[in-house]
Swiss-Prot record:
This is 5-methyltetrahydropteroyltriglutamate--homocysteine methyltransferase. It catalyses: 5-methyltetrahydropteroyltri-L-glutamate + L-homocysteine = tetrahydropteroyltri-L-glutamate + L-methionine. Pathway: Amino-acid biosynthesis; L-methionine biosynthesis via de novo pathway; L-methionine from L-homocysteine (MetE route): step 1/1. 5-methyltetrahydropteroyltri-L-glutamate binds at residues 17-20, 117, 515-516, 561, 605.
């Protein structure tokens, strides 16, 4: 039985972010739909060929998406919200973009669909909307067209489909409440149709993704898998695909299904290979996810070989990435600035394909010399001086309970803060960043390339900060921000100023739609060699009598949005970051900054996928935030910001952060997230986001007032702040001014209505 290689998916955006540039050009009206489609075809062809050349035997098809693969599945099933539909009922790429971002070059703008985190990753998906009595039909044939493309190029392929049960699990009911699982019988005929079309094309295997099978699902959802897969069986071979956790707790459900193979994530799960082999039906193929699809570290292939070799020859076996390589940068070979030693520790998507090929060849032949050679650098790293800092380890060991306690409880602090700031009712603010204009990006790029000296760079940044303050004062905002002109990314910026991180030139990964991020890599112990944000915050505060917030990214978010070390726990990394940023809080306070925002949008996304594992994570995650913040005096107001969150099940931990003010994303969910705070009787102040910054649509004054009145039905008005959902970095100035002007006007109207 020859072992084969495959990946669960490949990055979509292109090495130079070609897809992002094509999308944004099309959205801006600067290029045609045909030009956009051509870029997609070119990228798919390139990526298939690159994977093939790197040693992948079965290429994934259907992993490409114009915005998000869950949204692609919604269109496949004809699940288009009424507000986004074309007048003639047709579905096209602009339909997709209207759902994802609220507008497109054609059609009427409408509120974008909700967006949330894809399991516990930093990728976002567009949440499917379901209504009672909804009908489904095959309306979007992108998958079939891409299969035809790949077959025409002569590739051996494995189409990828998001499975029906997980698709329903990921969605939300809109309108009259009902059990969305009852729609399963209605979507299965579309899946049957698609599988029949794939069978007609000679497809042998289909990867059908059911990552919900790693969760602690309600019994009714577990019971739904058997009838669903009974309906789908028989047309092609199905590789039931799971990732991000192990499957052992749900293995009884899985082995009863009429599928021909199972993919398991052997990186993030705790499944035992021998037990899986023993319990799976003898004729099933096992796809072993041995190469980490979510990190950038070179694998110790000698360990991987030892992990799987015992079952070689005993059942059909493939070796694969743990999950889609969507979460990894594309190609390490173009990184020319990385230190040679550090570069030898890494592997990006194409190198991970090569790792799979090396592992396949060794498992098929029994020859391991190539694995030992490949693994030598990562083994040598364990003893590198770049990794360990005795002073950091000593400080971490000395943390006491007192380090995470503010001097007094919120009620006492709030009095001191009211006396200091004297803010009006319904105080207005923004979340931190202002539009990153072409001029700002060009300034940073010229400085980075050495085309601009430090003095001229600083003069330019100072001018943009000054303009941001002027804009906010004109708008009448109450608490200002400096606008973050000097920051490329909220995590990358801090990583650049902390020891223990390294950065790539082209290590882009998709976050959502056209948004890409370049996560820093944690390679060693973390410390702060010098103040990071103090100079610009102090300068901004000197320009105005209104309070200017100091802006920090919190320790858990920096951890979650970086590629972490694999040789220490996530708790250790988070607390090292917290100690470094604790010093930053103290320095900001000493510089006269009275309001300091510590963003933790990733706190919830970092949750383990199984609830039984949550408590331990939340305990150290909350402690890390408090270590970061607790150095502040009573009169210093600590804000935190969170987005894409369901808060119901972690309200105890949100309250335990003990932030004086929390700002949250609520506009896309029509303030329903505030139910959690109301039910919990959350004691501190809250700023529910009143408009969606991910959409270019400008909210009306009436819309914002209505949302705020809805918020005031749940939270006492004296504890409410008024702010957008998130930072304004990706928006343009005209829409930013218009939206903020309406927001300020709505707040003024509510003050006068008292």
């Amino acid at each position: 039985m020859t072992i084969l290689t495959h990946t669960l998916g490949f990055p979509r955006v292109g090495l130079r972010r070609e897809l992002k540039k094509a999308q944004e050009s099309y959205w801006a009206g600067n290029s045609t739909r045909e030009a956009l489609l051509a870029v997609g075809r070119e990228l798919r062809a390139r990526h298939w060929e690159q994977q093939k050349q790197a040693g992948i035997d079965l290429l994934p098809v259907g992993d490409f998406a114009w915005y998000d693969h869950v949204l692609t599945t919604s269109l496949l099933l004809g699940n288009v919200p009424a507000r986004h539909q074309n007048n003639d009922g047709s579905v096209d790429i602009d339909t997709l973009f209207r759902i994802g971002r609220g507008r497109a070059p054609t059609g009427e703008p409408a509120a974008a669909a909700e967006m949330t985190k894809w399991f516990n990753t930093n990728y976002h998906y567009i949440v499917p909307e379901f209504s009672k009595g909804q009908q489904f039909r095959l309306t979007w044939t992108q998958l079939l067209e891409e299969v035809d493309e790949a077959l025409a190029l002569g590739h051996k392929i494995k189409p990828v489909l998001l499975g029906p049960v997980t698709y329903l699990w990921l969605g939300k009911v809109k309108g009259e409440p009902f059990d969305r699982l009852t729609l399963l019988k209605d979507i299965l005929p579309v899946y049957q149709h698609v599988l029949a079309e794939l069978a007609k094309r000679g497809v042998e295997w289909v990867q059908i993704d059911e990552p919900a099978l790693v969760l602690e699902l309600p019994q009714a959802w577990l019971d739904a898998f058997k009838p669903a897969y009974d309906a789908l069986a028989g047309q092609v071979k199905l590789l039931l695909t799971t990732y991000f956790e192990g499957v052992t707790p749900n293995l009884d459900t899985i082995i009863a299904l009429p599928v021909q193979g199972l993919h398991v994530d052997l990186i993030h799960g705790k499944d035992d290979v021998a037990e899986l082999h023993q319990r799976l039906p003898v004729d099933w193929l096992l796809s072993a996810g041995l190469i980490n699809g979510r990190n950038v570290w070179r694998a110790d292939l000698t360990e991987k070989y030892a992990q799987i070799n015992a079952i070689v020859g005993k059942r059909a076996l493939w070796v694969a990435s743990s999950c889609s390589l969507l979460h990894s940068p594309i190609d390490l070979s173009v990184e020319t600035r990385l230190d040679t030693e550090v570069k030898s520790w890494f592997a990006f998507a194409l190198q991970k394909c090569g790792e799979l090929a090396l592992l396949r060849d060794a498992l098929n032949s029994g020859e391991t010399a190539a694995l030992e050679e490949w693994s030598a650098p990562i083994q040598a790293r364990r003893h590198s001086r770049r990794v360990h800092n005795a002073a950091v380890e000593k400080r971490l060991a000395a943390i006491t309970a007192q380090a995470s306690q503010r001097e007094n409880p919120y009620e006492v602090r709030a009095e001191a803060q009211r006396a200091r700031f004297k803010l009006p009712a319904w105080p207005t603010t923004t979340i931190g960043s202002f539009p990153q204009t072409t001029e700002i990006r060009g300034l940073r790029l010229d400085f980075k390339k050495g085309n601009l000296d430090a003095n001229n760079y600083r003069t330019g940044i100072a001018e943009h900060i000054k303009q941001a303050i002027i804009e906010q004062e004109r708008l009448g905002l109450d608490v200002l921000v400096h606008g973050e002109a000097e920051r490329n990314d909220m995590v990358e910026y801090f990583g650049e100023h902390l020891d223990g991180f390294v950065f790539t030139q082209n290590g882009w990964v998709q976050s959502y739609g056209s948004r890409c991020v370049k996560p820093p890599v944690v390679i060693g112990d973390i410390s702060r060699p010098a103040p990071i944000t103090v100079e610009w915050a102090k300068y901004a505060q000197s320009l105005t009598d209104k309070p200017v917030k100091g802006m920090l990214t919190g320790p858990v978010t920096i951890l979650c949005w970086s590629f972490p070390r694999e040789d220490v726990t996530r708790e250790t990394i988070a607390k090292q970051i917290a100690l470094a940023l604790r010093d930053e809080v103290a320095d900001l306070e000493a510089a006269g900054i009275g309001i300091i925002q510590i963003d933790e949008p990733a706190l919830r996304e970092g949750l383990p996928l199984r609830r039984s594992d949550w408590d331990a994570y939340l305990e150290w995650g909350v402690e890390a935030f408090r270590i970061n913040a607790a150095v502040a005096k009573d009169e210093t107001q600590i804000h935190t910001h969170m987005c894409y969150c369901e808060f119901n099940d972690i309200m105890d931990s949100i309250a335990a952060l003990d932030a004086d003010v929390i700002t949250i994303e609520t506009s896309r969910s029509d303030m329903e997230l505030l139910e959690s705070f109301e039910a919990f009787d959350y004691p501190n102040e809250i700023g529910p986001g009143v408009y969606d910054i991910h959409s270019p649509n400008v909210p009306s004054v009436e819309w914002i007032e209505a949302l705020l009145k809805k918020a005031a039905q749940r939270i006492p008005a004296q504890r409410l702040w008024v702010n957008p959902d998130c930072g304004l970095k990706t928006r343009g100035w005209p829409e930013t001014r218009a939206a903020l002007a309406n927001m300020v006007k709505a707040a003024h109207n509510l003050r006068q209505a008292k």
